[in-house]
Every structure is written in C-alpha cells, then in structure tokens.
Amino acid sequence: MMELAGQSAAELPDDEVFSLLKKGKTTLCYDGQNFFDTDHPVFEKVDGTGNQTTQVNLTVGTDNDAPTFYIVDTRLPIKPLIWQKRTAPEIEPKFDPAKSEHVFMEDEYLWGVRARGAAGFGFWQLIHRVEKTKLTKENVQKVIQTMKGLKGDGGKALNIQPNLILVPTNLEYAAKELFKTKQINGTTNILESELDVLASPFINE
C-alpha cells in the first residue's frame, strides 16, 4: 500500500501537467488566447505595437478517428508546460488518538502521502497540437515547418527546433515506425531520428 501511495505521489506532476495539456484548447495563456489556438497575435514591432498578424499552434483535420498528438520543442530552459513543486512528497502518518478521531474510535492507524505543486502553461510556441489528423510523414513535416517558421514580435525568428512527438499509447508503434526506422516500404525514411517518441497514457482519450 505504501508503495502504491508513493507511486501515486510520484505521478502527480504527470497527472496535473497532462490534464492541463488536454484543456489547452479552452484555457487562456499569457497572450489572451487559448493556449492551443489558430490566431495567436504577433506584432510588427518588438515593443508589441504596429500591425498585428497571427500564428498557429493547432491543426484540426477532418478524420474523427485519428488520435490527438503533439509535436514539441523541449530543448530550451523555458518549457511549453511547467510544473512548480511546492512541497516534495512525504509520508504523513496519523498515530495519535488525541489528534485523530479515526485513530481514537477505530484503533487504526492512517497513512498518506502529502505533496503540493501546480501545473501551468509556458510558451505556446514550443508545442503544436494535432487532432483529427493522421500521423503521416506529410502531416508531421507540415507541422514541423510551421513551428520552425514561428516569429516573435518585431519579426524575430524564434529558432524553434521540434525534437519530440508526444502520442497516446495507441499511436506509440506508429510513431516509432515513423521516427525510429531507416526504411519504410523500401524507401529511405528521411524522418528517422527527427523526433524522439514519448507515449503516455495520461493523454489517452
């Protein structure tokens, strides 16, 4: 039981971060848009003034059966999603009947794990959500090129270099075939090693 409690505490950051990730289409980020959106504002001048254009980090196709996946740049100190640890996990027992009605009435000790933290959004530019879109070479290349072309205010190139694809578990082997094999159907696979693959049950839908 204590091992399970410890495991649950260790998984708390993943649970919170990925839960927030799945809410990104309906949760605002620092620029006033939903974190995943098709119209993030970018301004002509570096001070945030001048003509406004928009950029995207959301692709929505028409294939309702295609699982959602994400392409991410994790290289930089700032991340697309952030976990702030406030209190490290620690076992917290209740032994004293003077302080616990349950211990007093039932003569049973209680054990738990206490931890505190919070998940939040970082830079939307570092992650792209792809939904209702098949995981294919062509679709991945489009997203990667979109991310690499992102600019900040004043037209500054952001040098986004995606290095990870985050997939639900039912896309794990398809993603590994796309990024971990030298050939596909007898043809050189130009996407080999382009992205690392991370499959997580926390984003299964």
What label would you give each PLM region?
Residues 1-26, 103-116, 165:
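Long, contiguous amphipathic alpha-helices that act as assembly "spine/axial" helices in icosahedral shell
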Residues 13-55, 59:
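Glycine-rich, mobile lid/loop segments that gate access to catalytic sites or pores
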Residues 7, 30, 191-193:
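A glycine-rich, acidic short-motif signal
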Residues 39-205:
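Sequence/fold signature of self-assembling virion shell proteins
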